[in-house]
């Protein structure tokens, strides 16, 4: 591979003759060598018109060359020098709607970075290839591609042993296989293109680095150790999206019964039911299964994953059930199997026997056994979820560390290598000793400091492999000493201010482009290094949560387990103190960054922003899950804490999200708890008005079925009208979270008084001004070059206390000249928002400044006409204040979609127009072949369906995640049928003997309510609101399918 400092040698592919000649003329302005040839030569940069499988394109990928777009030449020629290639490389950005796969889009970048990282000479450097192709132009082209990738191409007659690939046409492959001339595998000709552009890169280079890496890779066998390599951003983004989609799919399908599942239940009841009754139930179950498969194939498909992970857990559940039965039998309340209708207690127990139970039964012993089983169910469900997220198994730490202290001689050697900037040799020495010694923090910090200064760009990937192997071999939960080691390691090597400060600096540098805590290189690769460090941090925290979940799942005595060891999560987010409060300062900051990163992700297709958003949501999910696991173990009612604190906080912070953005945001959480409580908080804000008894109760299955489901059924009648209280006429609404700030700043809006008079006044004013507007605009455009002092005086990035920029202020004051000058400045953002969320276009529409609106629409094609605050768009602002002419301008640009937008009170823009004539004129601009009334009726119906769909999505998230978290599957129903009756006895005992500690049994109460709700679910389904059955939405249908599957499980077991 060529060094980036050498002279540029350029080749082109895929261009038509005219375009190619134009690019060649631009190359004459730059210092380079252009090779005009149809064959691939040893170039340094290939300029490709499009993604393809041409000889040059494949050869450049195989050789790890820069494969760039034509913009690289155009922009470099304008600058008079060669620019940095990174942002012009094919694979820098992945297009979602492209007909090319993400692997093909990212192939040039992936291969270049992989070969640069490993030091391999080419993609085929270990291949010994025999080509069985007719000698023609095509075979010559194949040879050039193979030789570019450093393959050893051998003639068929001189074929020695050790051939790795035989490439031939399909017909030749069959003939040669019959003759058995070659023992190597055969491949078709198109395999080369598929290997380079469509296949994942197989990382077999690590064995060349050092003996330690050989051992390490043999243990892993290609699995992800827990820390992704620094591959192309496109590949990372594709993997990120697949993780999210697979996670959401697995979580969404918890109630589908597989053959293995049903067999477990039938075997469990074999000693209770007679053979005749068992066969009857089996036939009934098979019939239901056929019907279920016919209707819901997609939902049933992913439940197979769950049965594999829970197979071992079922055996433990059976043992726990036997323990509970033995306790009951010991007390004389275990009936004969022929008389039993359920495994634990009979629901129809007489009142006289209830008194005997209260007198004779050891309630404390049974209560503890039940709580122990409930804990196991919860922790097993969480362990299964984490195993589904990451396919690699929990590592076994069987590597023996001879001595935690490095030999002094080796330590001095590596220090001298680093000081002499022999980084490759220093990293190789560390790698070779890593299996037997823990690398000293000082050495890792010394290398990291040079990585941050961009001095080790070529070998930075190997450094992160050392960190990855360190986490695999010596995790922080291995011992308290290792925890201290990681806390010392994960901090800035220069400032040494601690792990949280380092995490904050990394996030801010990636999210806001803020300066590092000390002076570092400003190269673009430094930002990638910061993101890679965040990946390591994320894998570190996720590993801790997985370890805690597995430990709690394996624990056998619920009364004796005490999680005493600390964790990095504990030290960073709760400063090592008591975790009674969830929302500490670090957690609050992480919440704000996560929400902000999601907003930025929704605005662009930048792979870097998407990857950063994924990491932040993952870190937040790990922190929340850790806090919840510890809280449940300590008997804390985490449901009430989460619902009151976290869910409400996030729902307020996401006030300006659209329903689609909220769906994506909720599904992006890896934590089922986060999904559930954020969905509930948004549902309450959307559908409930004011504080009610329903709002104050913690989330439960009973609350979802008895309270939220009927409310959802009435949404087609009430819509979203309950979201906020009515406001005064024409007064702008504002976010509740911003209202206090606006009152403090004295923000007042210009309001219309006496609407009919104002309409006539504005119409007369606008009609006269519009005639002169074009001429005046042209004059101002010509004179703006003569006003440099005006530009100097205006700092368009500066904001006042209300968050208003110079754009906001000139639109409020109708200063058209200054507006034109500002819009001509580079980097100006016409969609910038103040503290309340208003844009400059909002201000111009609200104040009736028609000329400003005209200039914005004319000069800013990127202006967002659908931007809103509590649903108030610029069109709402204009028409609510009587500015009809501005409304016409907006509709000419935005079309009928603007008329379909509703504010928080459910009002459409035309609802503000009282004059029928004005309303007809505004409606006519959209060229809709319909009447205003019919259009509004259709819009109303569509709006209610959207609201119902979004409500169904939120309710589905609550229901599926709640049942997943508390493991409300069929075996639970079978084993704990009598829990409701038993819990009444326990609560009665608690009221007498443990009144002060009644809150510690909140889990028993939750499970008792769950069973009670599940038993009446079939009757609830028969009385579902009609609109839920007729709504065609996907989320509504998914909600109904989930409820029906739950109901079917209960019916089969009754």
Swiss-Prot record:
Region (NSE5-like domain): 407-1054
Entry-linked CDD domains: BRCT_SLF1 (cd17750)
Disruption of the gene: reported phenotype: Mice develop normally, display no pathological abnormalities and are fertile.
GO BP, sorted A to Z: DNA damage response; DNA repair; positive regulation of double-strand break repair; positive regulation of maintenance of mitotic sister chromatid cohesion; positive regulation of protein-containing complex assembly; protein localization to site of double-strand break
Localization annotation: Nucleus; Cytoplasm; Cytoplasm, Cytoskeleton, Microtubule organizing center, Centrosome
Main location: nucleus
Keyword entries, A-Z: ANK repeat, Cytoplasm, Cytoskeleton, DNA damage, DNA repair, Nucleus, Repeat
Sample GO molecular function, one term: ubiquitin protein ligase binding
Domain BRCT: 2-80, 121-199
Expressed in which tissues: Widely expressed. Expressed in testis. Expressed in spermatocytes.
Positions of region (Disordered): 283-303
Biased composition (Basic and acidic residues): 284-299
Pfam families: Ank_2, BRCT_TopB1_SLF1, RTT107_BRCT_5
Mapped ANK repeat ranges: 802-832, 836-865, 870-900
Record has Repeat as a keyword: yes
GO cellular component: centrosome; cytoplasm; nuclear inclusion body; nucleoplasm; nucleosome; nucleus; site of double-strand break
Free-text comment on this protein's domains from its UniProt entry: BRCT domains are necessary for its targeting to ionizing radiation-induced nuclear foci.
Role: Plays a role in the DNA damage response (DDR) pathway by regulating postreplication repair of UV-damaged DNA and genomic stability maintenance. The SLF1-SLF2 complex acts to link RAD18 with the SMC5-SMC6 complex at replication-coupled interstrand cross-links (ICL) and DNA double-strand breaks (DSBs) sites on chromatin during DNA repair in response to stalled replication forks. Promotes the recruitment of SLF2 and the SMC5-SMC6 complex to DNA lesions.
Assembly and interaction partners: Interacts (via BRCT domains) with RAD18 (via C-terminus and phosphorylated form); this interaction is required for efficient repair of UV-induced DNA damage. Interacts (via N-terminus) with SLF2; this interaction links RAD18 to the SMC5-SMC6 complex. Interacts (via BRCT domains) with RAD18; this interaction occurs in a SLF2-independent manner. Interacts with SMC6.
Protein name: SMC5-SMC6 complex localization factor protein 1
Taxonomic source organism: Mus musculus
Lineage: Eukaryota, Metazoa, Chordata, Craniata, Vertebrata
Gene of this entry: Slf1
């Amino acid at each position: 591979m060529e060094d980036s400092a050498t002279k540029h040698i350029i080749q082109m592919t895929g261009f038509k003759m005219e375009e190619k000649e134009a690019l060649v003329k631009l190359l004459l302005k730059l210092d380079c060598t252009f090779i005009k040839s149809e064959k691939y030569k040893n170039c340094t940069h290939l300029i490709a018109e499009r993604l393809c499988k041409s000889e040059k394109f494949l050869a450049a990928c195989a050789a790890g060359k820069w494969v760039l777009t034509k913009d690289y030449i155009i922009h470099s020629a304008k600058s008079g020098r060669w620019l940095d290639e990174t942002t012009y490389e094919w694979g820098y950005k992945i297009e979602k709607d492209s007909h090319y796969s993400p692997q093909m889009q990212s192939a040039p970048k992936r291969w270049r970075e992989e070969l640069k990282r490993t030091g391999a000479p080419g993609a085929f450097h270990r291949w010994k290839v025999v080509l069985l192709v007719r000698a023609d132009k095509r075979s010559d082209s194949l040879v050039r591609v193979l030789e570019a990738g450093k393959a050893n191409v051998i003639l068929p007659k001189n074929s020695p042993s050790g051939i790795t690939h035989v490439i031939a046409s399909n017909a030749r492959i069959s003939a040669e296989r019959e003759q058995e001339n070659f023992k190597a595998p055969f491949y078709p000709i198109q395999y080369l293109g598929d290997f380079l552009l469509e296949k994942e890169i197989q990382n077999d280079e690590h064995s060349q680095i050092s003996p330690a890496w050989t051992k390490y890779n043999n243990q892993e066998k290609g699995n992800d150790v827990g820390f992704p390599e620094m591959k192309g951003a496109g590949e990372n983004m594709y993997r990120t999206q697949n993780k999210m989609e697979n996670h959401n799919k697995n979580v969404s399908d918890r109630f589908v019964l597989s053959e293995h599942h049903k067999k477990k239940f039938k075997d469990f009841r074999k000693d209770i039911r007679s053979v005749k009754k068992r066969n009857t139930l089996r036939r009934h179950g098979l019939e239901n299964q056929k019907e279920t498969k016919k209707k819901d194939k997609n939902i049933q498909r992913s439940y197979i994953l769950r049965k594999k992970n829970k197979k071992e857990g079922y055996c433990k559940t059976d043992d726990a059930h036997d323990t509970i039965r033995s306790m009951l039998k010991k007390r004389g309340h275990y009936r004969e199997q022929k008389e039993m209708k359920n495994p634990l207690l009979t629901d129809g127990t007489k009142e006289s026997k209830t008194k005997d139970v209260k007198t004779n039964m050891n309630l404390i012993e049974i209560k503890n056994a039940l709580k122990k089983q409930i804990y196991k169910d919860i922790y097993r469900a969480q362990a299964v979820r984490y195993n589904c997220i990451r396919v690699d198994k929990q590592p076994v730490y069987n590597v023996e560390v001879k001595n935690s202290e490095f030999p002094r001689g080796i330590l001095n050697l590596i220090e001298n290598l680093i000081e002499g900037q022999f980084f490759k040799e220093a990293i190789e020495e560390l790698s070779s000793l890593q299996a037997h010694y823990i690398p000293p923090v000082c050495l890792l910090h010394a290398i990291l400091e040079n990585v941050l200064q961009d001095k080790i760009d070529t070998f930075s990937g190997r450094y992160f492999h050392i960190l990855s192997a360190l986490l695999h071999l010596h995790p922080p939960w291995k011992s308290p000493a290792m925890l201290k080691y990681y806390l010392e390691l994960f901090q800035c090597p220069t400032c040494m201010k601690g792990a949280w400060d380092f995490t904050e600096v990394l996030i801010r540098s990636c999210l806001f482009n803020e300066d590092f805590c000390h002076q570092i290189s400003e190269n673009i690769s430094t930002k990638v290094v910061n993101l890679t460090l965040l990946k390591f941090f994320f894998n570190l925290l996720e590993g801790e949560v997985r370890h805690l979940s597995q430990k709690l799942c394996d624990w056998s005595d619920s009364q004796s387990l005490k999680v005493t060891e600390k964790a990095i999560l504990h030290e960073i987010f709760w400063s090592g103190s008591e975790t009674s409060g969830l929302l500490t300062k670090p957690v609050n900051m992480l919440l704000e960054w996560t929400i902000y990163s999601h907003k930025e992700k929704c605005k662009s297709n930048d792979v870097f922003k998407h990857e950063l958003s994924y990491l932040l949501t993952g870190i937040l999910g790990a922190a929340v899950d850790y806090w919840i696991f510890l809280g449940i173990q300590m008997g804390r009612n985490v449901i009430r804490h989460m619902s009151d604190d976290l869910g409400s906080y996030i729902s307020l912070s996401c006030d300006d999200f659209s329903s689609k953005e909220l769906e994506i945001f909720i599904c992006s959480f890896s934590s089922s708890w986060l999904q559930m409580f954020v969905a509930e908080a948004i549902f309450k804000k959307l559908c409930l008005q004011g504080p009610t008894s329903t709002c104050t109760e913690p989330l439960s299955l009973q609350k979802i079925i008895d309270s939220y489901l009927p409310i959802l059924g009435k949404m087609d009648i009430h819509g979203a009208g309950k979201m906020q209280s009515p406001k005064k006429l024409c007064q702008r609404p504002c976010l509740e979270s911003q209202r206090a700030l606006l009152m403090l700043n004295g923000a007042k809006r210009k309001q219309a008084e006496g609407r009919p008079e104002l309409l006539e006044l504005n119409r007369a004013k606008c009609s006269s001004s519009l005639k002169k507007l074009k001429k005046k605009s042209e004059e101002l455009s010509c004179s703006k070059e003569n006003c440099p002092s005006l530009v100097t005086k205006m700092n368009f990035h500066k904001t006042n206390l209300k968050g208003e920029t110079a754009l906001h202020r000139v639109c409020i004051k109708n200063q058209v000249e200054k507006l034109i000058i500002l819009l001509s400045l580079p980097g100006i953002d016409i969609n910038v928002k103040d503290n309340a969320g208003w844009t400059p276009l909002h201000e111009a529409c609200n104040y009736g400044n028609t000329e400003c609106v005209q200039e914005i629409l004319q000069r800013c094609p990127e202006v967002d006409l659908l931007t809103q605050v509590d649903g108030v768009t610029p069109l709402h602002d204009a028409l609510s204040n009587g500015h009809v002419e501005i409304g016409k301008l907006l509709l000419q640009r935005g079309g009928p979609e603007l008329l379909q937008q509703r504010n928080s009170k459910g009002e459409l823009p035309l609802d503000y127009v009282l004059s029928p004539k004005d309303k007809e004129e505004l409606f006519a601009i959209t060229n809709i072949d319909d009447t205003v009334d019919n259009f509004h009726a259709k819009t109303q119906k569509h709006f209610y369906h959207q609201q119902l769909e979004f409500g169904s999505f939120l309710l589905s998230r609550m229901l599926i995640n709640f049942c997943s978290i508390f493991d409300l599957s069929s075996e639970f129903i079978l084993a704990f049928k009598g829990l409701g009756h038993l819990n009444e006895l326990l609560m009665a005992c608690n009221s007498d003997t443990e009144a002060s500690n009644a809150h510690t049994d909140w889990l028993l109460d939750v499970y008792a309510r769950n069973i009670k709700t599940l038993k009446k679910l079939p009757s609830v389904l028969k009385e579902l609101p009609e609109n839920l059955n007729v709504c065609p939405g996907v989320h509504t249908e998914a909600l109904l399918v989930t409820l029906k599957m739950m109901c079917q499980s209960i019916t089969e077991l009754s």
